[in-house]
Protein backbone atom coordinates (compact mmCIF):
# COMPACT_ATOMS: atom_id res chain seq x y z
CA UNK A 1 0.00 0.00 0.00
CA UNK A 2 1.09 3.58 -0.62
CA UNK A 3 -0.06 6.63 1.33
CA UNK A 4 -3.05 7.22 -0.99
CA UNK A 5 -4.24 3.64 -0.44
CA UNK A 6 -4.00 3.97 3.33
CA UNK A 7 -5.80 7.33 3.32
CA UNK A 8 -8.60 5.93 1.14
CA UNK A 9 -9.09 2.92 3.43
CA UNK A 10 -9.18 5.14 6.51
CA UNK A 11 -11.64 7.70 5.11
CA UNK A 12 -13.97 5.01 3.73
CA UNK A 13 -13.96 3.18 7.07
CA UNK A 14 -14.86 6.43 8.81
CA UNK A 15 -17.55 7.35 6.25
CA UNK A 16 -19.26 3.96 6.52
CA UNK A 17 -19.93 4.61 10.20
CA UNK A 18 -22.35 7.37 9.18
CA UNK A 19 -23.46 6.47 5.67
CA UNK A 20 -22.78 3.07 4.04
CA UNK A 21 -23.44 4.60 0.60
CA UNK A 22 -20.73 7.27 0.86
CA UNK A 23 -17.35 6.51 -0.70
CA UNK A 24 -14.10 8.40 -1.02
CA UNK A 25 -12.06 7.89 -4.19
CA UNK A 26 -8.31 8.35 -4.35
CA UNK A 27 -7.12 10.21 -7.48
CA UNK A 28 -6.40 6.89 -9.19
CA UNK A 29 -9.80 5.39 -8.35
CA UNK A 30 -11.56 8.66 -9.21
CA UNK A 31 -10.01 8.41 -12.67
CA UNK A 32 -11.21 4.81 -12.96
CA UNK A 33 -14.71 5.85 -11.90
CA UNK A 34 -14.76 8.59 -14.54
CA UNK A 35 -13.72 6.11 -17.24
CA UNK A 36 -16.38 3.66 -16.05
CA UNK A 37 -19.02 6.40 -16.23
CA UNK A 38 -18.01 7.99 -19.53
CA UNK A 39 -16.86 4.78 -21.26
CA UNK A 40 -14.06 6.77 -22.87
CA UNK A 41 -10.50 7.83 -22.09
CA UNK A 42 -7.30 8.99 -23.79
CA UNK A 43 -4.49 6.47 -24.07
CA UNK A 44 -3.37 3.50 -26.16
CA UNK A 45 -6.45 1.29 -25.76
CA UNK A 46 -5.03 -1.70 -23.89
CA UNK A 47 -6.05 -3.37 -20.64
CA UNK A 48 -3.07 -4.27 -18.48
CA UNK A 49 -2.58 -6.71 -15.65
CA UNK A 50 0.11 -7.45 -13.07
CA UNK A 51 1.99 -10.72 -13.58
CA UNK A 52 4.22 -10.95 -10.49
CA UNK A 53 6.77 -8.19 -11.22
CA UNK A 54 5.83 -7.67 -14.87
CA UNK A 55 3.07 -5.66 -16.53
CA UNK A 56 1.40 -7.67 -19.29
CA UNK A 57 -1.22 -6.98 -21.93
CA UNK A 58 -4.55 -8.48 -20.83
CA UNK A 59 -6.59 -7.36 -23.86
CA UNK A 60 -6.59 -4.90 -26.74
CA UNK A 61 -9.58 -2.60 -27.16
CA UNK A 62 -11.04 -2.52 -30.69
CA UNK A 63 -10.37 0.69 -32.60
CA UNK A 64 -7.70 2.09 -30.27
CA UNK A 65 -4.06 2.95 -31.12
CA UNK A 66 -2.77 -0.43 -29.89
CA UNK A 67 -5.38 -2.22 -32.02
CA UNK A 68 -4.59 -0.18 -35.11
CA UNK A 69 -0.83 -0.62 -34.75
CA UNK A 70 -1.08 -4.44 -34.66
CA UNK A 71 2.15 -4.32 -32.62
CA UNK A 72 0.75 -5.54 -29.30
CA UNK A 73 -1.16 -8.66 -28.33
CA UNK A 74 -2.42 -10.39 -25.23
CA UNK A 75 0.42 -11.79 -23.13
CA UNK A 76 3.10 -9.30 -24.24
CA UNK A 77 5.21 -7.90 -21.39
CA UNK A 78 5.91 -4.16 -21.10
CA UNK A 79 9.25 -3.53 -19.39
CA UNK A 80 9.87 0.13 -20.25
CA UNK A 81 7.98 3.35 -21.01
CA UNK A 82 9.22 6.59 -22.59
CA UNK A 83 7.37 9.84 -23.27
CA UNK A 84 7.52 11.35 -26.75
CA UNK A 85 10.06 10.52 -29.42
CA UNK A 86 13.06 11.75 -27.44
CA UNK A 87 12.28 10.81 -23.82
CA UNK A 88 14.40 8.31 -21.92
CA UNK A 89 12.94 4.90 -21.11
CA UNK A 90 11.95 4.16 -17.52
CA UNK A 91 12.44 0.61 -16.32
CA UNK A 92 8.99 -0.36 -14.98
CA UNK A 93 9.74 -3.92 -13.86
CA UNK A 94 8.40 -4.31 -10.33
CA UNK A 95 6.23 -1.17 -10.51
CA UNK A 96 2.67 -1.03 -9.24
CA UNK A 97 0.12 -1.37 -12.03
CA UNK A 98 -1.40 2.03 -11.18
CA UNK A 99 1.97 3.72 -11.69
CA UNK A 100 2.54 1.97 -15.02
CA UNK A 101 -0.91 2.99 -16.26
CA UNK A 102 -0.26 6.62 -15.29
CA UNK A 103 2.85 6.61 -17.50
CA UNK A 104 1.17 4.97 -20.50
CA UNK A 105 -2.04 7.02 -20.51
CA UNK A 106 -1.84 10.60 -21.71
CA UNK A 107 -3.36 13.34 -23.87
CA UNK A 108 -4.67 12.62 -27.33
CA UNK A 109 -2.05 13.06 -30.11
CA UNK A 110 0.90 12.65 -27.71
CA UNK A 111 3.51 9.93 -28.29
CA UNK A 112 4.44 7.10 -25.94
CA UNK A 113 7.08 4.45 -26.62
CA UNK A 114 7.05 1.02 -25.02
CA UNK A 115 9.72 -1.64 -24.60
CA UNK A 116 7.90 -4.91 -25.21
CA UNK A 117 8.90 -8.54 -24.85
CA UNK A 118 6.61 -10.61 -27.05
CA UNK A 119 4.65 -13.37 -25.37
CA UNK A 120 6.46 -16.10 -27.31
CA UNK A 121 9.92 -14.74 -26.36
CA UNK A 122 11.99 -15.55 -23.29
CA UNK A 123 12.25 -12.90 -20.59
CA UNK A 124 15.90 -12.18 -21.46
CA UNK A 125 15.11 -11.63 -25.15
CA UNK A 126 15.88 -8.25 -26.74
CA UNK A 127 12.70 -6.13 -26.46
CA UNK A 128 10.84 -4.51 -29.35
CA UNK A 129 10.25 -0.75 -29.33
CA UNK A 130 6.61 0.09 -30.02
CA UNK A 131 5.73 3.71 -30.82
CA UNK A 132 2.09 4.69 -30.33
CA UNK A 133 0.21 7.96 -30.72
CA UNK A 134 -2.35 8.22 -27.96
CA UNK A 135 -5.95 8.80 -28.97
CA UNK A 136 -9.46 8.84 -27.58
CA UNK A 137 -10.60 5.30 -26.87
CA UNK A 138 -14.24 4.28 -26.53
CA UNK A 139 -14.89 1.33 -24.22
CA UNK A 140 -17.44 -0.20 -26.59
CA UNK A 141 -17.40 -3.67 -25.03
CA UNK A 142 -19.14 -2.25 -21.94
CA UNK A 143 -21.94 -0.43 -23.79
CA UNK A 144 -25.59 -1.39 -23.69
CA UNK A 145 -26.10 -4.18 -26.24
CA UNK A 146 -29.01 -6.22 -27.55
CA UNK A 147 -29.66 -9.74 -28.72
CA UNK A 148 -32.68 -11.67 -29.97
CA UNK A 149 -33.74 -14.86 -28.20
CA UNK A 150 -36.31 -17.08 -29.98
CA UNK A 151 -38.56 -19.47 -28.07
CA UNK A 152 -41.61 -21.58 -28.81
CA UNK A 153 -44.90 -21.54 -26.93
CA UNK A 154 -48.10 -23.32 -27.96
CA UNK A 155 -46.60 -24.17 -31.35
CA UNK A 156 -45.79 -20.53 -32.01
CA UNK A 157 -42.33 -18.99 -32.19
CA UNK A 158 -41.69 -15.69 -30.44
CA UNK A 159 -38.66 -13.46 -30.91
CA UNK A 160 -37.74 -11.57 -27.76
CA UNK A 161 -35.24 -8.73 -27.74
CA UNK A 162 -32.89 -8.67 -24.75
CA UNK A 163 -31.12 -5.39 -23.94
CA UNK A 164 -28.18 -5.80 -21.55
CA UNK A 165 -27.41 -2.63 -19.55
CA UNK A 166 -24.16 -2.99 -17.54
CA UNK A 167 -24.35 0.46 -15.90
CA UNK A 168 -26.02 3.87 -16.14
CA UNK A 169 -23.13 5.60 -17.86
CA UNK A 170 -22.75 9.06 -19.38
CA UNK A 171 -19.86 11.20 -20.56
CA UNK A 172 -20.46 14.15 -18.23
CA UNK A 173 -17.70 16.26 -19.77
CA UNK A 174 -19.00 16.00 -23.33
CA UNK A 175 -22.58 16.55 -22.17
CA UNK A 176 -21.61 19.73 -20.30
CA UNK A 177 -19.67 20.99 -23.32
CA UNK A 178 -22.72 20.53 -25.51
CA UNK A 179 -21.15 17.85 -27.70
CA UNK A 180 -23.95 16.71 -29.99
CA UNK A 181 -23.30 12.97 -29.90
CA UNK A 182 -22.10 12.59 -26.30
CA UNK A 183 -22.14 9.05 -24.99
CA UNK A 184 -24.91 7.94 -22.64
CA UNK A 185 -26.73 4.74 -21.78
CA UNK A 186 -30.11 6.29 -22.63
CA UNK A 187 -28.98 7.09 -26.16
CA UNK A 188 -27.47 3.63 -26.63
CA UNK A 189 -30.60 1.88 -25.35
CA UNK A 190 -32.73 4.04 -27.62
CA UNK A 191 -30.68 2.83 -30.59
CA UNK A 192 -31.08 -0.77 -29.39
CA UNK A 193 -34.86 -0.31 -29.23
CA UNK A 194 -34.91 1.16 -32.74
CA UNK A 195 -33.01 -1.87 -34.05
CA UNK A 196 -35.32 -4.30 -32.28
CA UNK A 197 -38.38 -2.51 -33.63
CA UNK A 198 -36.98 -2.86 -37.13
CA UNK A 199 -36.60 -6.59 -36.50
CA UNK A 200 -40.23 -6.79 -35.30
CA UNK A 201 -39.60 -8.47 -31.95
CA UNK A 202 -42.58 -9.66 -29.90
CA UNK A 203 -41.35 -8.12 -26.67
CA UNK A 204 -38.29 -6.71 -24.90
CA UNK A 205 -36.41 -7.78 -21.78
CA UNK A 206 -34.29 -5.16 -20.00
CA UNK A 207 -31.44 -7.04 -18.32
CA UNK A 208 -30.15 -5.09 -15.31
CA UNK A 209 -28.49 -8.02 -13.59
CA UNK A 210 -25.12 -7.04 -12.09
CA UNK A 211 -25.71 -3.41 -13.08
CA UNK A 212 -23.52 -1.48 -10.65
CA UNK A 213 -25.40 1.81 -10.95
CA UNK A 214 -24.02 5.12 -12.17
CA UNK A 215 -25.76 8.36 -13.07
CA UNK A 216 -29.12 8.82 -11.35
CA UNK A 217 -30.26 11.20 -14.09
CA UNK A 218 -29.47 8.57 -16.72
CA UNK A 219 -31.55 6.03 -14.80
CA UNK A 220 -34.44 8.53 -14.84
CA UNK A 221 -34.00 9.38 -18.52
CA UNK A 222 -33.78 5.70 -19.40
CA UNK A 223 -37.04 4.98 -17.57
CA UNK A 224 -38.58 7.83 -19.56
CA UNK A 225 -38.18 5.79 -22.74
CA UNK A 226 -40.94 3.49 -21.47
CA UNK A 227 -43.35 5.83 -19.66
CA UNK A 228 -45.16 9.03 -20.65
CA UNK A 229 -44.40 11.16 -17.59
CA UNK A 230 -44.38 10.77 -13.83
CA UNK A 231 -42.31 10.01 -10.73
CA UNK A 232 -39.39 7.64 -11.13
CA UNK A 233 -37.40 7.75 -7.91
CA UNK A 234 -37.60 9.16 -4.38
CA UNK A 235 -34.57 10.54 -2.53
CA UNK A 236 -34.77 10.78 1.25
CA UNK A 237 -32.20 13.00 2.98
CA UNK A 238 -30.90 12.60 6.54
CA UNK A 239 -33.36 15.24 7.83
CA UNK A 240 -36.31 13.24 6.50
CA UNK A 241 -36.97 15.43 3.46
CA UNK A 242 -38.15 13.49 0.43
CA UNK A 243 -37.43 14.64 -3.12
CA UNK A 244 -39.29 13.09 -6.01
CA UNK A 245 -37.43 12.91 -9.33
CA UNK A 246 -39.72 12.74 -12.35
CA UNK A 247 -39.60 12.10 -16.06
CA UNK A 248 -41.07 15.08 -17.93
CA UNK A 249 -40.57 13.89 -21.53
CA UNK A 250 -43.99 12.80 -22.83
CA UNK A 251 -42.55 10.75 -25.68
CA UNK A 252 -42.71 6.96 -25.19
CA UNK A 253 -40.09 5.16 -27.23
CA UNK A 254 -41.44 1.66 -26.61
CA UNK A 255 -44.88 0.61 -25.35
CA UNK A 256 -44.92 -3.10 -26.11
CA UNK A 257 -44.53 -6.10 -23.77
CA UNK A 258 -41.68 -5.42 -21.35
CA UNK A 259 -39.88 -7.40 -18.66
CA UNK A 260 -37.11 -6.15 -16.35
CA UNK A 261 -34.54 -8.54 -14.90
CA UNK A 262 -32.48 -7.72 -11.82
CA UNK A 263 -30.64 -9.51 -9.04
CA UNK A 264 -28.97 -8.78 -5.71
CA UNK A 265 -26.12 -7.00 -7.52
CA UNK A 266 -28.42 -4.55 -9.32
CA UNK A 267 -28.17 -0.91 -8.19
CA UNK A 268 -30.01 2.33 -9.05
CA UNK A 269 -32.97 0.58 -10.62
Language-model features, listed with the residues they occupy:
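Cleft-lining beta-strand/loop regions that shape enzyme active-site pockets
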Residues: 25-41, 50, 56-61, 65-68, ...
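Extended, domain-scale alpha-helical bundle/helix-rich regions
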Residues: 1-43
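Conserved catalytic motifs of ABC-family nucleotide-binding domains
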Residues: 75
